Amino acid sequence: MPRKPSPINLICLLLMAILMLPVVNVEAGHTDQPAIKCISAPVEDCVENMLRSMTLEEKLGQMFMIGIQGTDVDEESLFMLHQYHIGGIILFDRNMKTQEQVKQLNAHLQAQAGEKLPLFIAVDEEGGVVARMKEQLPPPPSAQEIGETGTPDNARLWARKTARALRNIGFNVNLAPVADIGTGRGRSFGNTPVVVTDFVRSAASGYEQEDFIYCLKHFPGLGRGKVDTHLDSTVVDASRRELMKWDVMPFQSIIREKTPADYFIMVNHATYSRLEKNVPASISKVIQTDFLRGKLEYQGVIITDDIAMGALSKYYAPSDVALRAVRAGADIILSCHVYQNGADAYHRLLRAVEKGEISEERINASLRRILRVKLTHLGKTT
């Protein structure tokens, strides 16, 4: 195991100098996390001040969301958090035993952020088969079950209930709702774009009412995919026009109506052969930059699906995936299970910037989007 690093104090000192306010707790009754404070400054001014205060290494760390292995913060997870300045954590059943234990774990994780930027702490709590700690935290109904009620407002009510339950044990991001059309295993609200759009829009409103970060997935839609991308690659043979008229409609509706700092969009690992041959969406500039940012004018955070899924890991090294994903337009690399994958990806991005393969301004563009979300939801500006 690599040697344990010394504590990282630079970002704490810089933020104290810039913001000149003590860290405060979030709303009473919620798990403590560092709060970002600005002195009567607009969010954009705070973003630029923070960006100027950060080293390249700290910026790159904010672009990673990783999984940890234990039920508490241990030496390995501490090393990852501090050595690589990690900006986000995702938890799975392996990390979660009881509600109180999860609350303490998340508090311990946030404590590692000190006076710097708070962590995104995420979970997949879609409902139905995709829900964590089911015996301790009763899961929401599946998206299919909610859709079958025929009442979109039920999606809003369940989103609010889910957000409250997750916040109470220290989470601040839910990687839901699924905006795919006709996905199997009960993960989709329906089989038509109109139905899915109505329910996704309602779910988004529920999360927003609770001031909770949510994530639309899996752009540009996995409903046509025939192979589970956890296992291997799948090819979608649809034109951009066909995607726009069907698969993309729920995403486009949210992009048009919602504030980009309120949510992420997750890109999937399917290959859309009529948009870009042999290139999965998660590493495709055509799909992320030209389509999602260009055509649809999305200005928020793009997060990849897990870079260790079979659709990528059978064909690419994790470090290559990270480099290609950032070049394509992604802001956050999701690495759920293996510490070394995250470390290798971080080092590859660092070398790429140092060698001029990626500009630091490209990294700054991602950081601006990430910081806007953290300033909006994980701290209070005054």
Give the location of each predicted region.
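Second-shell residues forming the walls of enzyme active-site clefts
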Residues: 55, 96-113, 129-131, 191, ...
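Active-site mouth loops of central-metabolism enzymes
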Residues: 63-73, 143-157, 232-246, 308-316
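Bacterial N-terminal signal peptides
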Residues: 12-22
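N-terminal hydrophobic targeting/anchoring segments and the immediately downstream early-domain regions
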Residues: 28-121, 125-135, 372
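Hydrophobic faces of well-ordered beta-strands that scaffold small-molecule active sites
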Residues: 61-68, 87-91, 119-125, 173-176, ...
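Glycine-rich, aromatic-flanked loop segments that form ligand/cofactor-binding clefts
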Residues: 110-138, 158-178, 196, 204-221
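Short, acidic/polar
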Residues: 70-82, 154-165, 246-251, 316-322
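Bacterial N-terminal signal peptides that target proteins for export
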Residues: 2-11
